[in-house]
Amino acid sequence: MYRQSPVRKKGAQGEACATGRNPTDRGKAGSKRHLLTDGRGVPLAVVLSGANRHDMKKLAQLLDAVVVEKPDPKQLEQHLCLDRGYDYSSCRQEAETRGYIPHIPKKDAPIPAPTDSFRHPPRRWVVEVGHSWFNRFRRLLIRWEKQPERYLGFIQLAACLILYRKLLRGSS
């Protein structure tokens, strides 16, 4: 008979400790980093949740967690590129209410062949690069901290170091 571990019993389905059953790791408790980056992969916002949470449920919290000041949408349009997992009317509405122009491909639409006619081709690799930069920090690769505040603090420290390195590289 299957018994739940004490970690999963805390909070409403793992919200208190930002962990949840990981569907890809035999149901062990795990956490997920939701990451918002700019066009170069530099992190703008990070939110933690349980590994079993869908990304679209944390979109509003992620957009509210942006640490840089957004320019006025009337002067400079802000585009938000998301993948097919965010193809819900609530996600489009959340992005539009915060002044973003959402670019979300339809779930049932075929993937277009890459051509030169794209003005701004979709680039999912930008977020993946951001995640790989976080994974270079050994403290973040495996979550040892039990409290989500401490783990989020280490993630934010890593984001500061990533931004600092990007600024150093850009200024020379």
Task: Outline where the language-model segments fall.
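Short Gly/Pro-enriched loop/turn and capping motifs at secondary-structure junctions
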Residues: 85-88, 108-111, 132, 139
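Flexible domain-boundary/linker segments
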Residues: 57-58, 76, 112, 147, ...
